[in-house]
């Protein structure tokens, strides 16, 4: 399957990634991506950017080198109540927010605690995507989370990077994907790139989705406008006109 969108990418601003915004855009253009999300880590990540970075996206272009640009954040969930490490006044300015659990920002809890964190964060209307919920460091009740995502119209990410960097993720990601298929919940495949050469490349995630027969209509990033319409329907991207 050809993917035209990657909403989960990092720049050197994240502190442990290795390419710049412009290098990422150039690579996205080179491989034919139509939409690129820049979602650097929130400020509680060691080495991450401060809030001024996220509050200054007004200076950034909407399109560059034939690529529509989404300026967002992979925000860290910092407690089991679903609190994020960026305040509401920043959240409302962003094009896209991925909410993720990272063990350097919150201690892994019990299945009940981790599930509660994800359930609670989906009550936040600015959250668009749950990031890498297949991470075995944070065991969850996958079916409860998937059903809540459908109720709250939140996208479930299938994170290609998890297959490589988070040992044991493959089985959980497959379980999550099968539940999304069962309950007809929209998913989005993300590279979680920390260097430009990973952008738009989802081989392991794509192979798994093919293996389980994931319906293409549930995959948001196999067309350019699916993600843009999704975000506009949430009141975002007000400056963007869709042809």
From Swiss-Prot:
Its cofactor is Zn(2+). CDD domains: PHP_HisPPase_Ycdx_like (cd07437). It comes from the Bacteria. Zn(2+) 2 binds at residues 16, 41, 194. Its EC number is 3.1.3.-. The keyword Hydrolase applies. Keywords: Hydrolase, Metal-binding, Zinc. The keyword Hydrolase applies. Zn(2+) 3 binds at residues 74, 102, 132. Zn(2+) 1 binds at residues 8, 10, 74, 192. Binds 3 Zn(2+) ions per subunit. GO terms for cellular component: cytosol. SUPFAM superfamilies: PHP domain-like. It comes from Clostridium botulinum (strain Hall / ATCC 3502 / NCTC 13319 / Type A). This is Probable phosphatase CBO3379/CLC_3322.
């Amino acid at each position: 399957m050809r993917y035209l969108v990657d909403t989960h990418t990092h720049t050197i601003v994240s502190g442990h990634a290795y390419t710049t915004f412009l290098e990422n855009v150039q690579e996205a253009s080179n491989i034919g991506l139509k939409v690129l999300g820049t979602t650097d880590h929130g400020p509680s990540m060691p080495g991450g950017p401060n809030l001024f970075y996220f509050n200054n996206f007004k200076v950034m272009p909407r399109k560059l080198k034939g690529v529509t640009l989404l300026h967002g954040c992979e925000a860290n969930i910092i407690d089991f109540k679903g609190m994020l490490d960026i305040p509401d006044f920043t959240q409302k300015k962003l094009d896209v927010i991925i909410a993720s659990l990272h063990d350097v920002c919150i201690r892994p809890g019990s299945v009940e605690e981790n599930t509660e964190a994800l359930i609670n964060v989906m009550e936040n209307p600015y959250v668009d995507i749950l990031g890498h919920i297949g991470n075995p460091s944070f065991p969850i009740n996958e079916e409860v989370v998937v059903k809540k995502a459908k109720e709250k119209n939140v996208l479930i990410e299938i994170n290609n990077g998890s297959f490589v960097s988070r040992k044991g993720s493959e089985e959980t990601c497959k379980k999550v994907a099968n539940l999304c298929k069962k309950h007809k919940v929209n998913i989005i495949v993300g590279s979680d790139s920390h260097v430009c050469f990973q952008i738009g490349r989802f081989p392991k995630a794509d192979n798994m989705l093919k293996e389980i027969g994931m319906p293409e209509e549930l995959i948001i990033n196999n067309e350019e406008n699916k993600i843009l319409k999704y975000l506009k329907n949430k009141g975002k991207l007000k400056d963007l006109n869709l042809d």
